[in-house]
């Protein structure tokens, strides 16, 4: 029975210029705000964010929860704890993302992992792309951005920017025994909430455009089972919060939680919700000065 390990809706390679739909809104100061200026400011913020985040470690708590047809919990969740950090290399080549998340497994269902214990299909990868990297100045070409007005997030005014991929590309499918990881480049659609004055990102929601059929190789097919899987839904929502640090004193807006819901017809894990929460942020000091 095939289990879907990871579904992503962005491609791996991006070039230089963003495609922008320049629809004007007004910020809280009454100044005109267009998508092109907003996206440029947010992209600059993401660069500064990565420069700071690379000196931070956080505990990531993951709950992998099977869901019933009505999307209620179905059985027990698998719970994992990781120590997580961001690696930032602005000079990375196009085929190797400049920002990555690296994980060290600390516990499985509250117990230390065994030395030879292999990860299960739905467990997070030890290394994965950082989700804001597509907003960097040289990584936006395959997206269209559109200003979507103002809103409020946790009492803060937020400008909203909608985005979607320019055109779909061929799915990238990687099989490992009965596990499969799927990237769906060119099928992303989403919304960014950002502070109109500081460009701090407060929330990021993303899903896929349309349904996607994935052929199941004969080796992975169940007896009498389907020859394909259909990805019907792959939605994620990232929420951010302010975190205060000392020595030196600094407040950063960092991830608080990520919730991901996937529905994959004809798979071994047809409905799953993965919840990630981030606690115990702490900074490790290197010989380099923290970039302002």
Would you name each region that the model predicts?
Residues 1-16:
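Bacterial N-terminal signal peptides that target proteins for export
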Residues 4-7, 20-21, 35:
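A general, composition-driven signal for non-globular sequence regions
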Residues 12-27:
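Bacterial N-terminal signal peptides
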Residues 29-189, 196-203, 207-292:
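Structured extracytoplasmic
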């Amino acid at each position: 029975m095939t289990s879907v390990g990871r579904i992503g809706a962005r491609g791996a390679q991006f070039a230089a210029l963003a495609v922008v739909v320049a629809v004007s809104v007004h910020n809280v100061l009454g100044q005109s705000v267009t998508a092109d200026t907003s996206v440029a400011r947010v992209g600059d913020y993401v660069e500064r964010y990565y420069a700071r985040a690379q000196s931070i470690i956080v505990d990531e708590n993951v709950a992998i929860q099977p869901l019933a047809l009505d999307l209620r919990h179905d059985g027990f969740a698998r719970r994992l704890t990781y120590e997580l950090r961001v690696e930032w290399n602005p000079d990375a080549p196009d085929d190797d993302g400049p920002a990555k998340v690296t994980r060290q497994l600390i516990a499985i269902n509250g117990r230390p992992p065994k030395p030879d214990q292999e990860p299960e299909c739905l467990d997070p990868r030890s290394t994965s792309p950082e989700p804001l990297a597509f907003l960097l100045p040289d990584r936006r070409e395959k997206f269209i951005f559109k200003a979507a007005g103002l809103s409020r997030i946790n009492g803060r005014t937020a400008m909203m920017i909608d985005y979607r991929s320019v055109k779909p590309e061929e799915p990238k499918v990687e099989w490992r025994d009965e596990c499969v990881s799927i990237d769906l480049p060119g099928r992303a659609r989403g919304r960014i909430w950002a502070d109109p004055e500081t460009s701090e990102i407060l929330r990021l929601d993303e899903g896929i455009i349309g349904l996607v059929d994935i052929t199941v190789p004969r080796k992975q097919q169940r007896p009498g089972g389907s020859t394909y899987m259909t990805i019907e839904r792959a939605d994620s929502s990232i929420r951010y919060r302010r975190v205060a640090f000392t020595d030196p004193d600094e407040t950063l807006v960092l991830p608080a939680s990520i919730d991901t819901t996937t529905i994959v017809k004809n798979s071994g894990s047809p409905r799953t919700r993965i919840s990630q929460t981030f606690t115990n942020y702490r900074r490790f000091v290197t010989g380099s000065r923290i970039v302002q």
